[in-house]
Amino acid sequence: MSKNNISHTSVRHKLSLIGVIVTLGIVFGDIGTSPLYVMKAIVRAGDTVNAEYIIGAVSCIIWTLTLQTTVKYVLIALRADNKGEGGILALYALIRRHSKKWYYLLAIIGASTLIADGVITPSITVLSAIEGLRAYEPETPVVPIALCIVTVLFFIQQFGTNAIGKLFGPLMLIWFTLLGVLGTMNIGEYFPILQAFNPLYAVRLLASSPEWFLILGAVFLCTTGAEALYSDLGHCGINNIRTSWAFVKIMLILNYLGQGAWIISHVGNLTPGVNPFYAIMPHGILFFGITMATIAAIIASQALISGSFTIFSEAMNLKFWPRQKIKYPTDVKGQLYIPFVNISLYVLCVIVILFFQNSENMEAAYGLSITVTMLMTTLLLSAYLTIKRTHRWAVTLFLIAFVGLESIFFVANMAKFMHGGWVTMLLASVMIGIMYIWYNATTIRNAQIIVRDIRDSYSIISDIKADESIPKYATNIVYLSKLGGTYEIEQKILYSIINKHPMRADHYILLHIDYQDTPSTLEYDTVTLIPDTLYRINLRLGFRVHPLVNRYFRQIIEDMVVQKEFSLASAYPSLAKHKVMGNFVFVLINRLYAAYSYFSFRDRMIMNAYEWIDKLKLSITRSLGLDTSNVLIENVPLVVRSRTSNHANAIPRVERVENEEEENVK
């Protein structure tokens, strides 16, 4: 047996000034554009806007950023990394072998709601930025401009954003500095706003306000980007994120304080629709501020789109989502492009912009589903802490604190349901349904595999190879196997080799692709089962590694030739004389489902739905990067196995009866 790494990549995210600046452009776009609409939403949420109300609301923002973003995500969640990678699916992959089976539900609910809320992010950030132009021209066509920006943004994804991406960090540094400076300039309008650092003002406001749920729904918008912060752990590293967050948090709080002070000082003459963010800008830099807000909105949207590609790629490898075509527009590690996801997100963003028309209407839809994501992350984090043998009292305290806090935010955001929140929840529900069906259908299909011991067939496979009366199908036949055990083989593969039509070849290779719980694993091992005849290759891929099986397989064969474990020479003397190599044919066993009554009702429903969803997936030959001219697909029925050990009981046995006419003949 031999074991090798196909490639080895060591990525270290050392703390550095450049690393911190790059992190600003990758991680904090979403949370960094929240000042565009949070205070405006808070003003709209209150029946009576006065100093006490604004101080309490800003206090809610400060302590939400402290408890939810800083404590939960920056201090705790970032420690739960999967070989340096973060995000809810990476967290699930880290704990799934040690947790309860139903935990996959937490992962698919969390991932679905994260993507659903992400449809709103580009729309609301771009609209909020462009609406600032109405300070110059009240009749500015905001929606058409926003649609143009979103269209260009999604269009350029296919070419990669590596070139302009290098500017994101410095531009976001300018943006956050602008936030801090503008806030500091306006705090002087009402110095008592600094009382907002006292959490008692937040408690007092929520306890005395009948519309507390509306207030919290608006406040929650300040931390919607926290989940993205965790998801981008693998791009930047924990130290760079934590260091840059200290700067980002200070700038955000200064800006919220400045907006709060301005609102209090102008509380008597607030006009409907006024955005405090633009109101605190000196008129001379307003155009610059709008330009920077638009750039920040584009950067935030770009980060979300890239993050969506990553989430779907992980979901495919975790068997949550049908395999889709993946492209790599640049050589940058981890930068990928999924056409189906890109066009789907684009269409949904356009629909959202046309449906809501402005950022005020969109605020009602924003934030609801992300609270569900955060709740799911909390539950998975508690499982992680338990696995890491954290003190039980600490895990319990963590659960009580954050399930309690996020449940309050969820209840508060439910007030948005009828005002637009249903949009993201509907989208999330569709995605949850697809993921649930795909995962369970895959599990059902794998459960029907009949396993045989390959050693029992050594002699007949060797005899088929030597039997020259059987036409040779190929020099090398590669069977894709779902089983990873050294001597395990599917009955259907044996049937293909021996029974269906004897598949004579010089070499038979069983290739098993094993998706790992780690993100970047790329390695293989080989076993020679019958010398110069039968081989097994186990290819292990991390959940963030694209399965370019054709390329990896070629590398493996080249390694085996160098190690003298395999020969590429043709068995035909005339071809071997001219050094013509033998050909390879991949054989894929495609098991077709039929709605047998002996499936349980649940399984029948899942498999029937699976048949429809299956039409969305990329063909297995394209998803694995195989040369279609060298692929044979054999369709076989999906035979249902018994839930007991007795396979014969799975299908009702036909009872033999006596033929009455035959009796009369006798």
Task: Report each predicted region and the residues it spans.
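The structured alpha-helical core of multi-pass membrane proteins
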Residues: S2-K666
